[in-house]
Amino acid sequence: MTISEKSNESELYGERFISDAEIVCFPNPSPNRTYEISIELPEFTCQCPFSGYPDFAIIRLLYQPGEKVLELKSMKLYVNSFRNRKISHEEVANKMLDDFVAAANPSWMQLEADFNPRGNVHTVVRVSHGLKNNC
């Protein structure tokens, strides 16, 4: 059996990991200290819900953790789960923020979805949760 025959026959392991993705957290090692965590995911893709064309973006997450911290590999898999999903820029930014907040319950969180220009239009969607404290 060739590789292409095998891949047509069953779900690839990467597809399986993405479809099973759930956001994982671990205990904050310094819960009594106010600090920020900055994460950038530069290869985000989804599909335009109107044209079906691919949209590409850099997702930037900045947050002040509470009792839990987001685990990076699970975030990557979660973000990759949007690859074949038809979703607007605004909806994806709000959905991701809601899901990250539900998982980690941060003191403060901001998510920025910086989409590549298309048709001479550059869109950046910024959403936030909670009140930011000085570090």
From Swiss-Prot:
- Record field: catalytic activity: 7-aminomethyl-7-carbaguanine + 2 NADP(+) = 7-cyano-7-deazaguanine + 2 NADPH + 3 H(+)
Using the record, list the residue span of the signal peptide; answer none if the entry has no such feature: none
Keyword Oxidoreductase on entry: yes
Query: Pathway, per UniProt?
Result: tRNA modification; tRNA-queuosine biosynthesis
Name this polypeptide is given: NADPH-dependent 7-cyano-7-deazaguanine reductase
Q: What does this protein do?
A: Catalyzes the NADPH-dependent reduction of 7-cyano-7-deazaguanine (preQ0) to 7-aminomethyl-7-deazaguanine (preQ1).
The primary gene name is queF
Q: Cross-referenced Pfam families, in alphabetical order?
A: QueF
Enzymatic class: oxidoreductase
Q: Please name the source species.
A: Prochlorococcus marinus (strain SARG / CCMP1375 / SS120)
Keyword presence, Cytoplasm = yes
Q: Which InterPro entries match?
A: GTP-CH-I_C/QueF, NADPH_dep_7-cyano-7-deazaG_red, QueF, QueF_type1
Among Gene3D superfamilies, the record links this protein to: 3.30.1130.10
EC number of this enzyme:
1.7.1.13
- The organism's superkingdom is given as Bacteria
UniProt entry keywords in alphabetical sequence: Cytoplasm, NADP, Oxidoreductase, Queuosine biosynthesis
Q: What is the lineage of its organism?
A: Bacteria, Bacillati, Cyanobacteriota, Cyanophyceae, Synechococcales
| Cell compartments where the protein resides | Cytoplasm
Similarity remark: Belongs to the GTP cyclohydrolase I family. QueF type 1 subfamily.
Which residues bind substrate per the record?
70-72, 89-90
